[in-house]
Amino acid sequence: MTRKLALIAAVVVAVALALWWLTVPATVPAAALPAYTPNLDNGRAMFNAGGCASCHATPNDDPDKVDRTKLGGGLALKSPFGTFYVPNISSDANDGIGGWSEADFVTALWKGTAARRGRHLYPAFPYTSYQHIQLADVRDLFAYLKTLPPVPGRVRRHDLGFPFNIRRLLGLWKLLFLHGGPYVPDPAQSAQWNRGAYLVNGPGHCAECHSPRNMLGAIIDSQRFAGGPAADGKGWVPNITPTGLQHWGDDNTAWTEKDIASYLSDGMNPAGDYAGAAMAEVIRNTALLNADDRAAIAAYVASLPPRQGPKPPAKRTDK
């Protein structure tokens, strides 16, 4: 009996050590980054493409009065797992990322790891998409962020229940769902299509909202871009594959590629309605992109394969 217990204990310890090793937060070493001169204009473009200000700008009750250069964080993101509070990513050395190295920043976007603290970041920060951003663009973005003003003040901790408050478990989540690397252009497609695919799947992280998720909070790949319930449980994010865009709204309006590009500029859809809720904030960002990038996004989105996503709840009819 004693030998059996000892064997069981040894197995438990071995499994625990294996899991501990498998869930070590991954990092990008500084030695992996060759000498580079950042392009601040491109960094600003990546800032807008990624919608950084939409989440990280210090909140204001009036969205029109938000200073998009002050990235003090604090926005509450409600989810089935609890409430996440968006961190300060201003250039403040103590409360923001002013003390980060370039390798720290690349590590956060590619690996979902807070390198200086040696711990996993929650995927409420969409590193499953940001891992596809090319290195030069990550470095340009970091350089641009450092030009923005420091904002003192540390954001409160996430409000998560057990077991979601155990960050180390995210290492197992990453083993399942964090795969891939920087975007590699498809030689069979045009330069415009590849640019759109890159912006949509990388910095734009469009699938993070426009896709349903499984019980572990990961995107269901077979229904990518097919819409689903909003992360906070309020409202519905539409299907942006042809299944949704060719039968839009109550009158089954069909979107053209030109309609998509125009919508990303002014927020008005083919039915004459304007973007609201979270999408209005997205339009604030896409409107700042150049026309070629908006056209590239439109070309890629228009090429998506039709996919049937979960069905939205029936609209209430007041009697």
Model-derived regions, located:
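The canonical Cys-X-X-Cys-His
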Residues: G43, A49-P59, F105, L141, ...
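Extended, well-folded interaction surfaces typified by the phenylalanyl-tRNA synthetase beta subunit core
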Residues: G153-R168
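N-terminal Sec-pathway targeting helices
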Residues: M1-A14
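Membrane-interface motif at the C-terminal end of an N-terminal transmembrane signal
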Residues: V15-A30
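Surface-exposed interaction/gating patches
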Residues: I166-A254, K258
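Electrostatic cytochrome c docking/interface patches
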Residues: A26-N48, D62, L172-N201, K319
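Electron-transfer interface patches adjacent to heme c in soluble/periplasmic c-type cytochromes
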Residues: K70-D104, T128-A136, Q223-N269, E281-A295
